[in-house]
Amino acid sequence: MIVTLIEKVYSFLWGDLVQIPLPGGSTLGISLLIILLIPTGIYFTVRTRFLPIRLFPDMVQALVEKKQEKNSLSSFQTLIVSTATRVGMGNLVGVVAAISAGGAGAVFGMWVTAIIGSSTAFIEATLAQLYKEKDPLYGGYRGGPAYYIHAYVEEKQKKKRNKVVISVLFAISGLICWCGISQVISNSVVSSFKNAFSIPPIYMTVVLVAVAAVIVLRKDATVKILDMVVPVMAVCYFAITILIIVMNLGSLPGVFARIFEEAFGFRQAAAGGFGAVLMNGIKRGLFSNEAGSGSAPCAAAAAECDQPVKAGLVQAFGVFVDTIVICSCTAFIMLLAPEEKVTGLSGMDLLQTAMEHHLGRFGVIFIAATLFLFSFSTFLGILFYARCNVAYLFGDNWASQTAYKVLALVMLFIGGLAAYTFVWDLGDVGIGLMTIFNIIILYPQGEKALKELKEYEKEKRK
């Protein structure tokens, strides 16, 4: 019953709403989410006058902003939290899923989401800063789409409201999404360790949940652990992927050719059609960089900034690095392996087989260990996101915060034993619904973020 419902909602959100015929008999399938995301990204890219390119130095500079309050987060720390979820699961499992379903051409779709998604990420993160509030439970600040949607409705209706329907729907969708991601995490880790060390799924699932419980049920552990783990694991993973690319430099032009040939239908891709290829890439690009979905603003709101724009610049930088740099590295690891060795494989089997080709047994063990660490960072990151949404729905009390953490741990356990396709569908449904509710408000509320950008640039010119 639940599986059937999830599949139907998934088809509505991600299924082909429009079919455009293309030369050669192929078709371009466009889903509801793509119809929302791509025009929104283009619109804000134009309105910000190509901010990701113009203000790239400002993005880097914003990372070193210092915080003044003890319990608040610096801009760099909020980037660490959002990067934990982006670089964690999205760059490994998300890229694997995109290429498994859509072939090499899906990588091009992911690049598209990053280029235009950076501007969307800037707008939503800036709004999160504008409408943040003090967090009486954890200290510091909290906010996100549920809060700036609420503020927009109050401003329009000119009266105070306890709850706003769209904000409630967004918060619930977020909790569904993050429960789905929890299952993807354990599903991928269990599969990886089974391939690397022949550990039965039930044993690895129990260990994963037990270690996660020790961390997440402590009040102040999340950001501290992420501060330690994320920079180290990202640098190590990046170094290994660069090594593999250098080892296969001669094959690199062929990989680029394959990406573009499959993306534009010149070569038959795994999913069979031009539309399906781009669909998978764009969908996984969203899952990876989160631009437009409303996830990262939950972290951006926690930053202590002297100007809201700086939080937006940090998150725009995160989208660029996440997809253009790190996602591409993962894609190249798989695509630089001989096609005959990875044909027919999916999930972590595909990535581990590719790593074994490049680095032998060490590659398999490295990916298993990396995925374990990435998964923990992702799990901690999504629980950080969930804080503000749980608080919006249930108020300031520890009972509801703890209850959601326990629910997430249960989902982590179920995911270790569930079917691969279903756990992805649940996450896709949640992030799809979040995106709809978020983007509906981004157009009218985005004007305030654009006004802040003008003030920021005016101040710079003085």
Give a label for each model feature.
Residues 1-89, 99-106, 117, 441-462:
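N-terminal alpha-helical transmembrane segments of multi-pass membrane transport
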Residues 36, 44-60, 166, 187-193, ...:
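Membrane-interface loop-to-helix entry segments
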Residues 40-45, 113-141, 150-187, 191-215, ...:
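Helix-loop-helix module between adjacent transmembrane segments
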Residues 47-52, 91-95, 177-190, 211-225, ...:
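Transmembrane helix-loop junctions in multi-pass membrane proteins
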Residues 50-75, 97, 103-106, 119-161, ...:
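Flexible loop linkers connecting adjacent transmembrane helices
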Residues 69-101, 127-130, 137-153, 169-172, ...:
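Alpha-helical membrane segments and immediately flanking helix-loop junctions
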Residues 116-124, 204-219, 230-250, 283-286, ...:
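Selective recognition of specific alpha-helical transmembrane segments in multi-pass small-molecule
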Residues 124-136, 242-258, 272, 302-305, ...:
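Extracellular/periplasmic helix-exit of transmembrane alpha-helices
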